[in-house]
Amino acid sequence: MNFLRNYLDKQKPKFEKGGKLEKFHSVFTGFESFLFVPNTTTSSGAHIRDAVDLKRTMIIVVLALIPALLFGIYNVGYQHFNAVGGLADTTFFQLFFYGLWKVLPMIIVSYVVGLGIEFAVAQMKGHEINEGFLVSGLLIPMIMPVEAPLWMVALSTAWNPALLARAFFFFSYPSMISGDKVWIAGDTADAISQATPLAQMALGQPLTYSTADMFWGFIPGSVGETSAFCILIGAVILLLTNVASWRTMISVFVGGYLMALIFQPISGVEAYQQLLMGGFAFGAVFMATDPVTSAQTNTGKYVYGLLIGAMAVIIRCINPGYPEGMMLAILLMNTFAPLIDWFVVQANIKRRLKRAKAVAN
């Protein structure tokens, strides 16, 4: 790394003001910041000191996503060969590489288009390149069906957060992001139909998947959303590094479980199974905890998380037309997050004023 650092230091003057490549300054600084910690300092005293900067935060989130991504790649191959009937004669590596062949183009398109636009806009406007797309570029293919067209993945890079992209295509092109066939890779016209657990629940059918299948992830679904176990590994990474809020994360599961208990007679499935189906676990860990769109106050995080979990189950059970209620619940509560924080702050102000008056008297 010292060789690379020395090389960049020698090339840096060419990209600074007055250099031959001055107009590519944003591109150079983008690559430099990705590889090394920026050497810029504040003009006045720093008020907050922390070992984690934005780049490290984004990298931690990406690392937390890797277990779910790797299993998702394997599961794409597993579901394909299970549908066509050749699972017993297929090795682990055949399953994994088939899934990689299907998922890797989605990841490449997402990053190439998204980062390409990010670099181009930063270059035109002279802004610094934002590392945030390191996460969004991976989230987009992970929350899409494996059979989603690549043009859809490319267009998804225009939205942030990534969940908004899925919502847009869900309502604009429902046939490409719903049904039974889109979750199974390859030509499965003559294969056994594999409905997701959510679809079976919405149709009032008995679940053909065991709780173990749903926990480990051997079910059809979006690329990165099937394995609750791998998502749990990612949750531990986010919580140990303080990147995600445990208040929000736990509240989502609590709210979802309590509401699932209430609606258990309607849904026909066990309450805990609701937490393992669809994108509930993935949304609770990686989407609801987005520090930009979620509630900021501690009390607000509890309220925000409880409402997301409860609303996700309500949408699933009341409206079978939208079996994946987690997406709509998170987007709706993202809208109300500032209002939740406002009420929490106002309540705190009133409580302190009341306490001050009591002391004064």
Task: Set out the residue ranges of the language-model regions.
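Structural signature of hydrophobic alpha-helical transmembrane segments
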Residues: 96-110, 150-154, 214, 218-228, ...
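Central hydrophobic cores of alpha-helical transmembrane segments in multi-pass inner-membrane proteins
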Residues: 106-120, 137-138, 157-161
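Membrane-interface helix-loop-helix junctions at boundaries between adjacent transmembrane segments
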Residues: 128-186
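Long hydrophobic alpha-helical segments that form multi-pass transmembrane helix bundles
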Residues: 162-232
